[in-house]
Amino acid sequence: MERVTHFEIPSDNPEQSQKFYNEVFGWNYHQFGNEPYWLAFTGAKETPGIDGAIMKKKHPQQPMVCSISVKDINASIKKIESSGGQIVVPLMAIPGVGWLSYFKDPDGNIFGIMQDDKEAK
């Protein structure tokens, strides 16, 4: 069974959002690369839960997205399409991290799928 392992919170003002979630929940952040994208650390590794990110919104209606870790992203894409889902962001490499794609389920909810692969380029 594959699990939700990451979330992304889009924000018009990422710094304000970081401050809010830090003050309310104690989350800490680290900027990832040169993009306006900050990894959010929500607790100690031994504590149940998932980490995520706060990112600058790319468009006004950008939804919050949860991502699911998969073992074989190409097989997952085929299953999504054959089960009535739609790929909305094609497969792309996150260099040194893995492979990522976004899909819409039959109800219109958007999720990410991620396959770890340190060799991704």
Where are the model-predicted features located?
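Core segments of cupin and vicinal oxygen chelate
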Residues: E2, E8-G49
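Vicinal oxygen chelate
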Residues: V4-D12, K57-E81, S83-K121
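A short linear hydrophobic-aromatic micro-motif
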Residues: N28, G52, I87-P90
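Acetyl-CoA-dependent GNAT
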Residues: G33, I54, D116-K118
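Short acidic/glycine-enriched loop/turn segments that link adjacent beta-strands
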Residues: N34-Y37, P60-Q62, I94-W99
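Short, charged/polar, Gly/Pro-enriched secondary-structure boundary elements
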Residues: E46-D51, G108-F111
